[in-house]
């Protein structure tokens, strides 16, 4: 078997190794983030590689980053409570309005493959207030949200890692991630997934997501999760 790196467009365009996820429907097909190709090539090249590997009897596992998004297209005003990055249990201030880059409209893709757009309501935390750039080392918990349960207990709660942290408790988020997974299986033919940064995502989410994909595929999928501990 062969584990291939994240194949979709990241915030760094052709230089992004894939973990700064911008658009999971762009496998090197659209002019976004100043590049059509990803670091690993075009969509056509990726699909050809997967096809040839499978023809040779080699299973292919796709690196999959479900934890966060980065490189939003629009800033959105929202309210949030600040926490120190090293302490997710005790707020360091009261809720206030911030300006967060949480609007993902993917103008370069223009609705091809999916019309879903991300907004602040689909995330639970960010780490930068563009109206207050001097405030660093801060995690902003968005209004009405909570840090995911069933995650690593480092820093009291290690649900937040980077970028715009997906709110897996939001039904639209779960539906969209399942929709993307089905699309990815149909379009690439991969045999399974390597799930990135699972200690930052609620453990209860994965059985639901995998069940939806395996029902769609009509078979068991090989899945392994990355859980990094210092």
Predicted regions and their residues:
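Short, solvent-exposed turn/loop segments enriched in Gly/Ser/Thr/Pro and often Arg
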Residues: 3-14, 64-73, 197-202, 225-229
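Aromatic- and acidic-residue-enriched segments that line the glycan-binding/catalytic groove
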Residues: 12-27, 67-150
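The substrate-binding groove and active-site-proximal loops of carbohydrate-active enzymes
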Residues: 20-43, 71, 75, 126, ...
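Active-site-adjacent "subsite" loops/lids of carbohydrate-active enzymes
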Residues: 81-82, 88, 142-182, 187, ...
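Aromatic-lined carbohydrate-binding/catalytic grooves of carbohydrate-active enzymes
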Residues: 2-40, 58, 209
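Substrate-binding cleft of carbohydrate-active enzyme catalytic domains
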Residues: 38-72
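Active-site-proximal helices and loops of the catalytic beta/alpha 8
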Residues: 6, 19, 49-54, 58, ...
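Short, mixed-charge, low-aromatic patches
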Residues: 3-6, 131-140, 159-169
């Amino acid at each position: 078997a062969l584990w291939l790196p994240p194949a979709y467009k990241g915030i760094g365009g052709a230089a992004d190794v894939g973990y700064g996820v911008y658009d999971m429907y762009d496998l090197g097909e659209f002019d976004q983030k100043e590049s059509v190709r990803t670091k690993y090539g075009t969509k056509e090249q990726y699909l050809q590689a997967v096809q040839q590997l499978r023809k040779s009897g080699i299973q292919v596992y796709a690196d999959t980053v479900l934890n966060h998004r980065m490189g939003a297209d629009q800033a959105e005003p929202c309210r949030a409570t600040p926490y120190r990055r090293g302490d997710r249990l005790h707020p360091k201030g009261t809720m206030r309005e911030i300006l967060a880059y949480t609007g993902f409209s993917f103008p370069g893709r223009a609705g091809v493959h999916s019309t879903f757009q991300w907004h602040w309501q689909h995330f639970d935390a960010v780490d930068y207030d563009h109206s207050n750039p001097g405030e660093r080392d801060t995690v902003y918990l968005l209004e009405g949200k909570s840090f995911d349960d069933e995650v690593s207990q480092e820093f009291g709660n290690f649900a937040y890692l980077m970028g715009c942290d997906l709110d897996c408790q939001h039904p639209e988020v779960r539906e969209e991630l399942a929709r993307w997974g089905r699309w990815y299986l149909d379009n690439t033919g991969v045999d399974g997934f390597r799930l990135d940064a699972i200690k930052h995502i609620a453990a209860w989410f994965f059985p639901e997501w995998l069940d939806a994909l395996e029902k769609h595929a009509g078979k068991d999928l090989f899945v392994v999760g990355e859980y990094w501990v210092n």
